[in-house]
Amino acid sequence: MSPSGDRSTLHAPPLWRQLQLAARLLRGVQSGHSLTAQLQDVDGAMRPGVQALVFRALRWWGLARALRSQLAPRSPAALPDALLCTALGLLSSQDPPAYAPFTLVDQAVEAAKRDPAMRSSAAFLNACLRRFLREREPLLRQALHGDLAARWNHPPWWVERLQSDHPTAWAAILASAQQPAPMDLRVNTARSTVDALRQRLSAAGMQSTACTGAAVRLARPRPVQEIPGFAAGEVSVQSAAAQLAAPLLLRGL
């Protein structure tokens, strides 16, 4: 999924359906289930969009939970609560917006209406989310005041551990964790080259940057099936940092 504003491709799955699945996955994460394993059970056509929503919501989950506590001091049932927090995480995110706020609210309410397990909570979700849109700034100020989990979107014990272990860098470390991870590729140098891959990416409308060695970074993440040469084994997905690990270790031997 590559939304711009609230636009998407004509064949993209409806946002309300993606939100339903995202809420169920996030509910599973809260219950201790692996997100990676859960994503494998999502239909292939739905997976890229659902994964993007889940990753974005998780990056702002601490703030979303604090906002939900203000909007609904008594927690709703588990699944509607997950949908509400998912929507609040997406609405409060400082990432470039994927959808217009009113579109997101409308589709979150639609997601509740179309799910028998959440239908009775649709009006409640609508009221909470529309209140957030009306009172966004004061609600955010209150949520962030003195709440480490809301401010940094990590458990307080982890924030305190970083403060202790990295007294001059802890804030930068936590801030970097809020940034969407880049999508790095590794060229199979037995079958292609960095320059050849970048030319093919450019021809496919994908901007890229050559990193060190065989690494290429995409300007915007894309589904792997769209990447030229991926299916043929000419390129794989691996972070540029991980690609440096083996050479650095060998250099130290």
Model-derived features: positions:
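SAM-dependent Rossmann-like transferase core, predominantly class I methyltransferases
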Residues: 218-253
